[in-house]
C-alpha cells in the first residue's frame, strides 16, 4: 500500500456524502502525476492509463470513465466510488490492489500490472501448458476468495480483459463494478450494455431465459468456463457472430467449439476441459462451486508440473575460422595499372598480373574489399612472385576488409616458406583479423607446429586471445594437436586460461575425450578442478560426454569427484541421469558421495529413477542409500517413478524397500500419482506392497477420487476390490461416486 497522504475533499456537488465514505482511500488529482499518461487499455465504458506519481516515483494504473469527466451528481459517479471502496477492502494476492480515487480526471487509482491483461496476451503470445494451467488456477483462487467473503462478492464481469498479469505472469483480477450496475439496469439494458462491453459471451443462459433471474455464484462459474476455453484455445468465443445469434445459441445449450481440443493435448489439459464443461452446464445447479473448482485446478496444476529438471546438456561447438574468398580478378583499371607500374618494372608487372586464367585484376575488388596484389600473390602461393613484390615499397601488413593480412593467409594455407619471407620483411605476428584471430591461432588450428614455432620465434604472443577468449592452446586442445600443445607449453603458455564461457584448455580436451591432451595438460600442472561459468569442471564434461579414459585419468590425478555445478549437480548426478553405469561405478570407487543433493534436493537415486536406469538403481540400493530421500516438493524416488508411469522402476524400488505410503508436501502418495497416470501394473505393485487405499491428500482427495475424475473404470474397480470407499466424501464436498457420475468418460 502506498503511503497515506492528506485527502482533498471532492466537490460536494459531485459526490455528496460519498466523500465521507472513502475510508482510507487517497484522493488524487492529475497534478499528483507526471504529465505523460499512456493509454494501456480501452473499453466501451472506461479507459485505463499508466501514469507515474511525482513524489513516490511509482507507476500506477488509473481507470477513467470518458463519460464522467464533468462534475456531475449522476448515479454512475456514485457507482464508480462505491466500486473503489469495495475493491479497497479486498486484500488478496490474486486481486488487484486499489490505492485511491482520482478527482480530476474522475477515476480509480490501482496498482500497475506490467504485463497488461490476459485479453491482450492471448492473441500475441503462444502460452505453454504449465502457464495456461497456472493462470486458470490463480483465477479460480481469486474467484474462490471473492465468493468466500460474507456475504459473497460476485464479480459478474469475469473475462480476460479483467484478468491482469504482473511481470512474472501471475494473475490479479480487477473490476467489480458490474454488480451495482446490474441492480440499476433492466434485463434488456444489461444485455445491451454487455454487448457494448464485449461481455455478452460470458453471460450464462439463465440470464437470457429467466426475466427475473437474479445472478448468483453460478454466473461467475459459467464466465470462468468461457475464460478456460479462451486460455486453452487462445481464440475468441463466438468470433464473427452477432448479438442475437450468440444469445440464441447459448440459450439453446450450445457452447464454443471444441474442434481445437486435440488428442495430443496432455491428460491434465483434457481433465481441465472436463472441468470447463461442468462449469458451463446449462443447469446452474450442476455447476461446481469455486471451492471445488480451486481444489481441482490445484490438483491438475500440481500433477502437470513435474518437479524434476534435467541437468543441462553441455554443448561445445567446434571452433573454426575459415580464410576469406579472394575472388580472382578479371581486369585492372588504368589507374591501378599505373599505380602498380610506378613501383614495379614492366616485366614484373606482367608477372604479377598473371595470377589466374584471366591474367588480370579487378579494380573494384582491390579498393572495395581492400584486397591488394600482395594478398592475391600470397593466396596463390608463389614464393618468387611475393619476393619480387616485397622488393618494392608495399605494405607487408596490409589488411582486407575482414582484417586478413598476407601473413594470416600464408599461415592458414600452411605455407611456412611464405610465412618466413613475410616475417623477414617485418610482418606483424600479432596483427589479428576482425574476429581476433592472430596467425598463431591459425597455426594451432591446423596443427602446424613448424609455422607456430616460426611465429613464436618472431614475437607472437603465446596467450593471444580471439574475441571469445580462445587462446592457441584452446584450439590445439580442441583439435587434438599434441605437437602444437607441447610447443605452446614449452613457451610458457598459460595452462588454465578461461575463454568467455569459462572453459580452460583442459575443459576442451576433456569434452572431446582427447586423452593425450588431458594427460599433457594435467601433467604440466593445469588446474584439474577449474570451473567454467556454470561451475562445471573438466570432470563434469568428461562424464557427460562418456569419455571413460579422460575420466579415469582426471580421477587418478586427483580431480574432485564431488565438485558441484551451478545447479548443484556432481559428476555422479550426471552419470546417474545419463545412465552411464561404468562411469557411475568408477566415480564410486574414487569416493563420490551417494547422498549429495542438487539445488532442487535430488539425489543420484532420484535422477536414476526419473530416467529409468535400473542398473544404477540396483547399484545404489546395494550401497544402502536412503530409498525414501525427499527431493523437491518432498518427492521420493517412488513418487517420481509413479509420476513417470515407470512400472518396472516402481517394482524395483518397492522390492528394494521403498515406502509406498510416503506423502509429498501436498499429501500425494505414489498411489495417487500412479492412478493419475493410469499405470495399471504400477497400481497393482503398490497395492501388493501395502499402499494405503484410503490415503488423502491435503484437500481430501483419495486415489479413488482421481480414478473417478478420470473416468477410469478398470482402475476404479481395482481400487474398490482393494476396499476403496466410493461413497465417502472424506475431506472434500463430493464422493468418488459423484465425480464418476459427472465424468463424461
Curated annotation (Swiss-Prot):
It is an enzyme of class 2 (transferase). PANTHER family: ANKYRIN REPEAT AND PROTEIN KINASE DOMAIN-CONTAINING PROTEIN, ANKYRIN REPEAT-CONTAINING PROTEIN-RELATED. GO terms for cellular component: cell projection; cytoplasm; nucleus. It holds the Pfam family PK_Tyr_Ser-Thr. GO terms for molecular function: ATP binding; protein serine kinase activity; protein serine/threonine kinase activity. This is Ankyrin repeat and protein kinase domain-containing protein 1. It comes from Mus musculus (Mouse). Residues 34-301 form the Protein kinase domain. The lineage of its organism: Eukaryota, Metazoa, Chordata, Craniata, Vertebrata. The active site is at 157 (proton acceptor). Gene3D superfamilies: Ankyrin repeat-containing domain, Transferase(Phosphotransferase) domain 1. The keyword Kinase applies. Keywords: ANK repeat, ATP-binding, Kinase, Nucleotide-binding, Repeat, Serine/threonine-protein kinase, Transferase. One of its GO terms (biological process) is cellular response to retinoic acid. It catalyses: L-seryl-[protein] + ATP = O-phospho-L-seryl-[protein] + ADP + H(+); L-threonyl-[protein] + ATP = O-phospho-L-threonyl-[protein] + ADP + H(+). ANK repeats lie at residues 369-398, 402-431, 435-464, 468-497, 501-530, 534-563, 567-596, 600-629, 633-662, 666-695, 699-728. Its EC number is 2.7.11.1. Belongs to the protein kinase superfamily. TKL Ser/Thr protein kinase family. The keyword Cell cycle does not apply. ATP binds at residues 40-48, 63.
